[in-house]
Swiss-Prot record:
It holds the Pfam family Rit1_C. GO terms for cellular component: cytoplasm. Present with 259 molecules/cell in log phase SD medium. It comes from Saccharomyces cerevisiae (strain ATCC 204508 / S288c) (Baker's yeast). This is tRNA A64-2'-O-ribosylphosphate transferase.
Length: 513
């Protein structure tokens, strides 16, 4: 009897526990669902970005008032009003990941060198998602970049450069074991840069007067940003601008992380749910809003009283207005307005950026014909308006060639390699009969930094010397030659962050070699 009762009791207890476990699971599942919903909330994201911007404006800039802001693309752009900066950087966190430490020859960021010299320092702005205090781009990628340049510069006067003297990493973020591994990697990365033959020890010494690039990290909670309090009155004292110590032969590179560490869905102190690194992967939550649109309409989008639905409707209206404006520009605007500030690469090649959804009408086509002998566009949404009166377009070699390939898409980048023979066949006439005055070609993609760059690289490697002089002989081509042309292209396009994807460069190499 007792045995039967104990069995019945145990079965009831087990049933109760299983029901309780299921309820706990359902509760946790609902909590996770709510957190994901709050993380995707446009209102929470935009308010979090503004809170982080307030940290930048109130705590960082007063300490370093003389250094220009350099938002690190893409995330950093959201935290800086476009009126507050003139340049951006592109340091990727992947170049700082464990066992992937690198000095990228695709992302040299050499357009910053003169800015660093002229202002005796810069502030690079970025953010990071939950779990980290500093993104890898700021804790390792930029410091490695600085260490490589420091080492190369010191080789002008020192035979054996002590890497400890030039490599600085945040000890609270990067363990000593990883520091040692990165230190051993630096000579290899210096040699990699030297092979490109684009900058040497002498030039770096002239630029920085022998001063080392010294990363300095700031983030919410940094002791460097602590304000002083009057001991008697309790009043917060005004911030004093930081000065480079006279005994330090350095140029400060301020690496600013604007977001603070917070567990998802937990911080609701400010009337919204704070999202750490809110601007990251904006395509997943912004409904087409970009950083420029955000700051241009900050009065409405920054108003915390509006709901997600109201913000969504407003963003949809902005997108519609942007499309109407594009239609007006393509009809009435200049070619620079339509194709994003066209850059001249050589006398024969120009680079542009084409807007998604553009329809090239007869008026725009005539403008293009007045300036160019050939237009090549990579986009899956750009079209040419049908024009039955234009008999010139009925030939086999049309003036405008549109390839339905999209920058930023790996499949498109891979498909590029099979497209190269056709492209080079189309442009051949522009490089023959050079005695005749032939108009240059315009090459565009939807970013102006990826597929169009790949095509231009293939042309530079096959039609030009390393000094970009036209040649009728096919130059010797190797991966090093491709990198040299890319490096020169990056230096030439100071106002544009050139960043062809690995897949695009693989297609270029496959075609050329």
């Amino acid at each position: 009897m007792v045995s039967r009762l104990s069995k019945r009791y145990r079965s009831r207890v087990q049933f109760s526990i299983s029901v309780m476990d299921e309820n706990i699971y359902l509760s946790l599942s609902q909590i996770n669902k709510d957190i994901r919903k709050e993380n995707k909330s446009v209102r929470n994201r935009l308010q979090s970005i503004l809170l982080d911007n307030k940290f930048l404006q109130d705590r960082v800039i007063p300490i370093f008032p003389h250094y220009p802001l350099i938002p690190n693309e893409r995330c950093g752009l959201w935290y800086c009003n476009p009126s507050s900066f003139k340049q951006t950087s592109y340091f990727k966190s992947t170049d700082g990941h464990v066992n992937q430490w690198d000095f990228s020859t695709r992302r040299l960021n050499f357009h910053l060198l003169e800015t660093i010299r002229d202002n005796k320092g810069i502030i690079i702005v970025d953010s990071t998602r939950r779990g980290k205090k500093i993104p890898d781009a700021l804790s390792k990628t930029v410091p490695i970049w600085c260490a490589v340049l420091n080492t190369l510069m010191l080789q002008e006067t020192e035979k054996n450069v002590a890497i400890d003297k030039v490599l600085y990493l945040p000890p609270e973020t990067v363990p000593k074991s990883e520091y040692d591994m990165i230190k051993r990697k630096i000579p290899e990365l210096v040699a990699k840069l030297q092979k490109l033959n684009i900058i040497d020890s002498k030039k770096l010494n002239e630029l920085f007067m022998g001063k080392l690039l010294r990363p300095i990290w700031v983030h919410p909670g940094s002791s460097l940003l602590d304000h002083s309090v009057d001991y008697f009155t309790g009043e917060v004292q005004e911030y004093e601008a930081w000065e480079t110590p006279e005994d330090q032969n350095i140029i400060p590179i301020i690496l600013c992380t604007v977001s603070y560490q917070a567990q998802d869905g937990m911080d609701k102190r400010y009337g919204f749910t704070y999202v750490q690194g809110a601007a990251d992967d904006h395509e997943l939550w912004s409904f087409g809003l970009d950083s420029n649109m955000f700051w241009a309409h900050i009065e409405y989008l920054g108003d915390a009283s509006y709901s997600d639905d109201q913000l969504h409707d407003y963003i949809m209206d902005l997108a519609a207005a942007k499309l109407r404006n594009q239609c007006y520009i393509q009809d009435k605007g200049s070619l620079d307005e339509v194709f994003g500030n066209i850059d001249k690469i050589t006398n024969e090649i120009s680079l542009g950026k084409v807007s998604s959804g553009l329809t090239i009408n007869k008026n725009l086509k005539q403008k293009l014909k007045s300036e160019y002998g050939k237009v090549i566009i990579f986009s899956n949404s750009v079209t040419v308006a049908e024009d039955t009166d234009d008999e010139e377009e009925s030939g086999t070699d049309p003036f405008i060639s549109i390839y339905k390939l999209q920058s930023g898409d790996k499949k498109s980048s891979k498909a590029l390699r099979s497209t190269f023979p056709r492209i080079h066949g189309e442009i051949q006439s522009l490089f023959t009969n050079r005695d005749e005055k032939i108009k240059p070609m315009l090459i565009c993609c939807n970013t102006g930094t990826d597929m169009s760059i790949g095509v231009i690289l293939s042309i530079l490697c096959t039609k030009y010397t390393e000094e970009w002089m036209l040649t009728s002989e096919l130059p010797d081509i190797s991966k090093l030659i491709v990198r040299k042309h890319l490096t020169k292209l990056i230096s030439h396009l100071k106002g544009r962050n050139v960043n062809p994807s690995r897949a695009t460069l693989n297609s270029v190499n496959s075609f050329l070699m």
